[in-house]
Amino acid sequence: ILDSIATSGEEILYCGDDSAGELGDILHYCFQKWHELSSDELLPEGKKSELFELFLTHFAEGCLKEFDWWWDWIQMAIQLADDEEKQGRIIQELDKVINIKGDEWGINYNRQVAQRHKLEIMSKRGTPEEQFKFMYENVSNPDFRRRLLQMAWDRGDYKEVLRLAVDGA
């Protein structure tokens, strides 16, 4: 039922009258239930894998891409990605978003969100040095710049703090 509602969600929102917010509330409720399911540690392995595939497929196919719910798909897949193979598949999907060319607001927003999720996956499987390098390579991401500023401040590298701050201004 949850899947049927969510996969029809875009059509429902585009074609229906959601001026009272009720259609969006239904989708929000579905995602709330999915988040609960994906965080359930007692969920059988078979169900976890099934949900992982469902979530990653919906993300890859762009289900609800015009809405922030699209990012819920990948968040839940990340929560269920308990091995390197699954984590690698998520990174592949995130890289597709990161590598989209363009300077439009939506492209930049999606790129930054995808970079944050990729860093989250890297924290599960990569080294701190790899994460640090990734943040520096993507220092235009405001979240990464803030983290790098804080890290430089914490280690007393005020020259680097100044450089990062000036470059970001």
Give, region by region, the residue ranges found by the protein language model.
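Eukaryote-biased, non-catalytic alpha-solenoid scaffold regions
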Residues: 1-169
